[in-house]
């Protein structure tokens, strides 16, 4: 996997409509316990999106307000499910349950250099 394709254009074509160019970048993270996470960021949308492969499925996150860094929520309206936080070259993943419990799933994630 490549570290970043900043400025790359992804062309989405829908039947019966014009193609749309979207700014897409991919960053690979190395986390605690040797976990690897590939995150795809789509910044031209409102809200911006992040897509991660978690527990065998693709999860789409929407950018939500944060005090510092970038915060992406799986279910931004209810603030439950997966939450992906990034700041600089660091990131972490948490789970927010309906009862308000918050569980850290991945900590100490850092962007990994390309080989």
Please report, for each region that a protein language model flagged, where it lies by residue.
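Bacterial N-terminal signal peptides that target proteins for export
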Residues: 1-8
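Absolute protein N-terminus
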Residues: 1, 21-22
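Cysteine-centric segments in proteins
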Residues: 22-115
């Amino acid at each position: 996997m490549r570290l970043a394709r900043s400025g790359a254009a992804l062309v989405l074509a829908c039947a019966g409509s014009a193609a749309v160019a979207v700014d897409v970048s991919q960053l690979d993270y190395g986390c605690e316990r040797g976990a690897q996470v590939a995150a795809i960021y789509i910044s031209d949308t409102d809200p911006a999106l992040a897509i991660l492969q978690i527990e065998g499925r693709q999860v789409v996150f929407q950018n939500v307000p944060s005090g510092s860094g970038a915060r992406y929520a799986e279910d931004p309206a209810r603030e439950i499910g997966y939450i992906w936080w990034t700041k600089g070259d660091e990131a972490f993943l948490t789970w927010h349950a309906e009862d308000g419990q918050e569980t850290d799933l991945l900590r100490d994630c850092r962007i990994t250099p390309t080989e």
